[in-house]
Amino acid sequence: MADLAPHQQVVRSHGPAAGKIGGINHLVLFVGDLEEAVTFYRDVLGLEIVRTQPRFSTNALSLQGKALMSSGDLGNEALVDHSVRQVFFKLGNGELFSVYEVDGVEPEPDASVVSFLWPDGSSKPAERPAKLDHLSFDVASRDEIVWFRDHLRSEGVVCSDLVERRGSDDSHRFLTSIYFSDPSDNPLEIATFDWGDPGWEGYDFDAWFRDPEPVPTLLVPRT
């Protein structure tokens, strides 16, 4: 290890929890109009609705009788109190994605920290990073990315062209993506690793560790 460059010394997995988290359980976005969101995510992006929540109040009193708190305590009882509706969508790999419509709150998310990737006109300008930077959906191949780009544009959605993260000689390969926003200006991405591409055969994944000056914790796990 001592003879390797710092970016080649990254400790990739460590500790008793290694490998126990199998994927994303769910993500939640705020939306300004639930009907618009359902139309967009179900009818345009093709996600399956698997759960709907009736309007509920986001306070400790309303939670009692609806959820079991193992500690017996309800924290942050006075922190928030809004009227919320929620819809859950299922992705093709079984992971869940959800949207909140919140009464009395203008959910104008600020920009992604990589907002230059989104095309002009796809979302409102902003001054600080969003709480959830962006949501990226996975598809199986580059052909599906092309299909979604054309499909979204046919639906009137402002969508970027393909962003291909690979060197001109395929020396570094990563994602192929498109960028767009939902009707509530939440920044979205559809991406693929395109694992069926023959270019992955024999690929050296050490190339994914690119930071020449990794933060110290990446190199030395907690003892």
In which residue ranges do the predicted regions lie?
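Vicinal oxygen chelate
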Residues: M1-A17, G23-G32, V87-G92, V113-T223
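Short, P/G- and charge-enriched loop/turn segments at secondary-structure junctions
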Residues: G15, M69-A78, P119-K124
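Short Gly/Pro-enriched turn/cap motifs at secondary-structure boundaries
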Residues: A18-G19, N76-V80, A126, D169
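Core segments of cupin and vicinal oxygen chelate
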Residues: F30-P107
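Beta-hairpin (beta-strand-turn-beta-strand) motif
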Residues: G92-G94, V102-G104, A140-R142, P183, ...
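A short, polar/proline- and glycine-enriched secondary-structure boundary/capping micro-motif
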Residues: E108-V114, G199-G202
